Amino acid sequence: MAPPHVVDEQVRRRIVVEDEIKSKKQFERNYVPMDFTIKEIRDAIPAHLFIRDTTKSILHVVKDLVTIAIVFYCATFIETLPSLALRVPAWITYWIIQGTVMVGPWILAHECGHGAFSDSKTINTIFGWVLHSALLVPYQAWAMSHSKHHKGTGSMTKDVVFIPATRSYKGLPALEKPAVEEEVSEQEHHHHEESIFAETPIYTLGALLFVLTFGWPLYLIVNFSGHEAPHWVNHFQTVAPLYEPHQRKNIFYSNCGIVAMGSILTYLSMVFSPLTVFMYYGIPYLGVNAWIVCITYLQHTDPKVPHFRDNEWNFQRGAACTIDRSFGTIVNHLHHHIGDSHQCHHMFSQMPFYNAVEATKYLKAKLGKYYIFDDTPIAKALYRNWRECKFVEDEGDVVFYKH
């Protein structure tokens, strides 16, 4: 027989689980989709915030590149430190800082793909292609698939990434409705018990580490986390189902960028050594990938955010079901506020990134309860969402994540 304090803790946990389930079910049952039109939302934001300033955008690029150069220059002194005990933490510090700073140009290239960088399509293409190619991102190819994501955000059928799996896809038995709606069924409670007690923290952390490290390149190469397709999909095939025939030349251009950057890295490896290139560029590059996966996953995945089937979905409802989060003052600044103004970005992707924070104030006032901001610490949110956002039901026009 378990000691009394152990039994009490088990009872307390069961009560907490039941309360969480009831609260979540009540929120989902009472949820009413937003009825604002996109024009009503746009009219709530001052017109001057939509004006793009090419010079201002280029200055952001210069600032980011100068910052990267300064961090790189400081790292060149690491090997002069007298002991390994000093060099190891110095390298780790460099990798963390440089990986964080390099996200800035990644975001600016992403803005180019939306046409938010400049009124000039040529300027957008040049800056976007150079910046994304330097980070081994196929600029045109990803910009086109990302555009489809924006057009179908929140839709179970139209989105191309972060689409929830369904109960049947997971091979789970159909959920039996309880006799009394307010009660928690034994099946549902058991489902939550499994999530809490059977899925160990080490398993969750290991899965998160894998996705943060390899999720982005796997998405580009094999469409990992993307929409199901009849055959192998990637961002480098000119005949991939992600693209139309008239877009094939753009895939060729983006592939040229990857080949060019790969050639530069190969040349530098021959001149300085592969290890040197990996230390200065490779590990920060992995850091950039981890940031991108972390940011985008948390923007589109949360237990309280619905997804819609065709009868209830429209563009503005899907755009409103993205989540703003603060990553801290410094990181928000370095990442051009892509994390804490993302709902505004999804509503108006051609709005200049440097106006999105101010525009978010007006957006929040207009949307009211439909504006979503989550202040959960980032690491905790990652762990919670990975544990709790497993699937949605096969039925229903408005569905929420379950586990």
Swiss-Prot record:
Chaperone among keywords: no
GO CC terms of this entry: membrane
Catalytic activity annotation: a (9Z,12Z)-octadecadienoyl-containing glycerolipid + 2 Fe(II)-[cytochrome b5] + O2 + 2 H(+) = (9Z,12Z,15Z)-octadecatrienoyl-containing glycerolipid + 2 Fe(III)-[cytochrome b5] + 2 H2O
Pathway where this protein functions: Lipid metabolism; polyunsaturated fatty acid biosynthesis
EC number of the protein: 1.14.19.25
Topology term for the membrane: Multi-pass membrane protein
Sequence motif Histidine box-2, location on chain: 146-150
Location in the cell: Membrane
Ranges spanned by the short sequence motif Histidine box-3, renumbered to the chain: 342-346
GO molecular function: acyl-lipid omega-3 desaturase (cytochrome b5) activity; oxidoreductase activity, acting on paired donors, with oxidation of a pair of donors resulting in the reduction of molecular oxygen to two molecules of water
InterPro entries, alphabetized: FA_desaturase_dom, Fatty_acid_desaturase
Superkingdom in the source lineage: Eukaryota
The protein's enzyme class: oxidoreductase
Extent of motif Histidine box-1: 110-114
Disulfide feature: none
Residues spanning the membrane: 65-85, 88-108, 123-143, 202-222, 251-271, 275-295
Sorted UniProt keywords: Fatty acid biosynthesis, Fatty acid metabolism, Lipid biosynthesis, Lipid metabolism, Membrane, Oxidoreductase, Transmembrane, Transmembrane helix
GO biological process: alpha-linolenic acid metabolic process; unsaturated fatty acid biosynthetic process
Domain comment quoted from the record: The histidine box domains may contain the active site and/or be involved in metal ion binding.
UniProt family annotation: Belongs to the fatty acid desaturase type 1 family.
Entry function: omega(3) desaturase that uses both 18-carbon and 20-carbon n-6 polyunsaturated fatty acids as substrates.
Protein name: Acyl-lipid omega-3 desaturase (cytochrome b5), endoplasmic reticulum
Native species: Mortierella alpina (Oleaginous fungus)
